[in-house]
Amino acid sequence: MIGKRQEYERMHATEQSLWWYRSLHRRVAHTLTQRFGERKDLVILDAGCGTGGLLESLRQQGYQRLEGFDASEDAVAFSRERGFEVAFHNLLAVESYHPTRTYDVIICNDVFCYLNDSQIIQILKEFRRRLRPGGVFITNNNAFSWLGGTHAVALKISKRFVLSELTAYAQQAGFHVWKGGYWSFLLFPPIAVVRSWQNLQLKRGWVNAETLSSDVHLPAAPVNQLLNGCMKLEETLLPLAPLGSSVYTVMEVTHG
C-alpha cells in the first residue's frame, strides 16, 4: 500500500467513524483492559501505525505513553496531523528502532500481509525481545486467502492468514497465543459473497486491476450505524469467532 496516497487519505478520513475501524479499536481497548485492568500508564508501540487512528482512539481513552512508526511518508504525515510524533521507519528494520526501548504493549495491525513467513518470524522475535514482563503483542490480520477480492489487488496484499499460521509463527518466535480468533462473523456471509463475485470478475478479466481501489469507504450513516451495531453485538456475544474476514491474535511471551 506504500505509495498509494489516496488510500491513506481514505484511511485518515474514515478511521474514527467507519464501523470496521471502530470495532477493531474497541477490541484492542478491551484486550488492554482484560490484561492490565484500568492502568493508563502502559507504554504502547503501534508498529505500522498507518494514519494514527488507533493511536488517537487510545489517547481518547486516557493512554498517553504512545509511540508509533510507519514506512509510508504519507501515513506518517497524516499521523503527525493528529499530533503524534511518529517516526518514519520500516518494520523490516524494527531492530534499529530505538533498540533499548521496551514496551508493555506492541501492536501491529494489518501489516503482515505484505511480508513473507521468515520476515514475520524475525519481526516477532524482535517484538518478543522488546516486551516488558507481562506484556503482550496484539496483531489483527486479514483472514482466508479466498477472501482477497479486488480489495487485495488494489492494496497489493500478498497474503491472508488463518489462526493456525499465526499460532505457528508465535511458537517459532517464543510466544504463546493468549487469545485468538476471527471477527466480523455476523457479516461473514455477505462479505464472502461480495469477495467471491470480485474474484470471479478478476479471473474473467471483467475489471481493470490497474484502476481498482480498496473497499475502505464510509457508507451512508444509517448503514454504518447498523454495521457498527452488528459488530457491538458480536463483540458482546462472540468476541472471537470460528469464522470472519479478520483474525485477531494476542500473544504473550513463553516462559520456561
Give the ranges of each region predicted by the language model.
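Alpha/beta-hydrolase-fold catalytic nucleophile elbow
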Residues: 109, 140-141, 183
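Conserved N-terminal segment of class I S-adenosyl-L-methionine
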Residues: 1-101, 105-109, 118, 124, ...
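Short, glycine-/aromatic-enriched active-site segment of Class I SAM-dependent methyltransferases
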Residues: 12, 137-159, 168
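A short glycine-rich, Lys/Arg-flanked "PGG" loop and its adjoining helix->strand segment in the class I
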Residues: 121-133
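A C-terminal cap/extension of S-adenosyl-L-methionine-dependent methyltransferases
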Residues: 138, 187-256
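A short His-aromatic
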Residues: 113-114
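Conserved S-adenosyl-L-methionine
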Residues: 175-185
